[in-house]
Amino acid sequence: FSKSKSLIAKREIKPKYFKSIALRATIERGSLQGIDPSNISLSLGSNLHSVSYPIDNRGQFNFISILRKKLNIKELSDYSLFEKKDFISSILSEISKQVDSNIIKNLKDIRCFPVFVSSEVYQPINKNTFLIGDAFFSFPPTFAQGASQSIEVAHELYKNLENSIGEFNHERIRRTKMIDQKSKFNYFVFH
């Protein structure tokens, strides 16, 4: 979660734990039986959704699972928890109840992360300061929108500066709130 917003606001802006864990790994195309390698694959489960998609031309895929999971304050403050083999194994065990065991046993470079989201849209006081990406607003992970939002917003900012249009922040806040609502609805539907 970006600390840029807190630095610019001159106050601590804390993210909100979204009661979810993201598991990210890589997997070879041959281990993804029944999945079209030329498309993004989305699987929905109970309190779980998984996505796999190609990342190169050599047959490597990213595998992402978002698992609904409550953690207490002690667990959330222990950043090393998400690197511990026991914790990762417990997350894999929960995911394996709904994902093909052939996929689970062939995952490589497995990492876990807590999912944090923004609870408010922060608008910098200085009109010449623009935040983009997670520094502006962190969405729930249902649209794979992080990178796409950053690219889209960077382009909109460029156009705004090029044409001296002053509507950038107003329109962006409206759009951010709409995307956030859709993301939360998708998360509800996916789980």
Which residue ranges define each predicted feature?
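Conserved mid-domain beta->alpha element of the FAD-binding
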Residues: 86-88, 109-188
